[in-house]
Amino acid sequence: MEQGKGAINTMDDILNVFNEFIAEFESYNDMVKVKSVPPPTPPKPVKKTPSPTLPKPSKQKQEPQVEVNEDRESVSNLLKKFKDSPLILCGHS
């Protein structure tokens, strides 16, 4: 390809550029030796460990255990205290 030409205009210019590319690629390809890739090694077999046996759930229904704390205040009393308290909820004054 001649120096000084600005753009590729004709089909001949395109073919010239393509042929230059092919020639450069072939000269590069001659310099590089392709190494053969070894076949992948098969994965090692995984030994299965026996899963631990979980205790079977008993068939008797168990009532949930709820502790009642008599010292606790009712929710409505707590809400009243909270409503009356001078607590500032946001940082802007």
From Swiss-Prot:
<feature type="compositionally biased region" description="Basic and acidic residues">
    <location>
        <begin position="60"/>
        <end position="72"/>
    </location>
</feature>
<protein>
    <recommendedName>
        <fullName>Uncharacterized protein ORF18</fullName>
    </recommendedName>
</protein>
<feature type="region of interest" description="Disordered">
    <location>
        <begin position="35"/>
        <end position="72"/>
    </location>
</feature>
